[in-house]
């Protein structure tokens, strides 16, 4: 079972998308400085059961379903992503899974496949000294799948503020 604790409609977490963001519990990463340590616990409601109704309610106003975490039941995550895709919504996963900092874009597919090949995927544990996605020094990376090249492209720079 995959559980979610709460939900929100967000506009910045996935560039160019209006996302239904779902905070997934049972996070295995336990990052120091985590802004949501309660998500480490196995708490919340059954997402697989509730997702059809959530998509019925919010589907016309969103373009993406964002899973903030992947929980501990990858089969349920895949089924939830599949349901969103069948409704013609994009999918995104934020994971604390670390990947090599010098990874080539063509190798990102290997790691994304572990998360059922979402349209967007954010990799990387939160490291306070490096900052989150908005920091140019972050270890975190956000990728978007490009169906034309059949590769994930690094879009992390879209989170960085432009100098004024």
Language-model features: where?
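A general structural detector for well-ordered alpha-helical segments in enzyme core domains, enriched
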Residues: 50-54, 76-81, 110-114
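Core AdoMet radical
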Residues: 35-48, 60-74, 89-105, 115, ...
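Short, acidic Gly/Pro/Ser/Thr-rich loop/turn segments
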Residues: 29-32, 128, 150-152
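P-loop/Walker A phosphate-binding loop and immediately adjacent motor/lid segment at beta-alpha junctions
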Residues: 73-81, 85, 131-164
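Alpha-helix C-terminal capping segments
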Residues: 55-59, 84
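Short, flexible, glycine/charge-rich loop motifs used to bind or transfer phosphoryl groups or to couple energy/partner
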Residues: 11, 54-56, 109-112, 131-132
């Amino acid at each position: 079972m995959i559980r979610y604790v709460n939900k929100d409609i967000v506009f910045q977490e996935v560039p160019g998308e209006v996302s239904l963001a779902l905070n997934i519990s049972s996070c295995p990463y336990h990052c120091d400085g985590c802004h949501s340590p309660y998500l480490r616990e196995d708490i919340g409601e059954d997402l697989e059961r509730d997702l059809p109704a959530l998509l019925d309610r919010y589907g016309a106003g969103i373009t993406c379903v964002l899973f903030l975490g992947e929980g501990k039941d990858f089969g349920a995550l895949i089924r939830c992503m599949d349901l969103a895709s069948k409704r013609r919504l994009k999918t995104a996963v934020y994971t604390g899974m670390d990947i090599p900092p010098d990874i080539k874009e063509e190798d990102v597919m290997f790691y994304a496949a572990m998360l059922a090949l979402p349209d967007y995927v954010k990799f990387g544990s939160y490291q306070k000294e490096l900052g989150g996605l908005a920091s140019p020094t972050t270890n975190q990376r956000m990728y978007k799948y490009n169906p034309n090249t059949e590769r994930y492209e690094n879009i992390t720079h879209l989170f960085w503020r432009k100098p004024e």
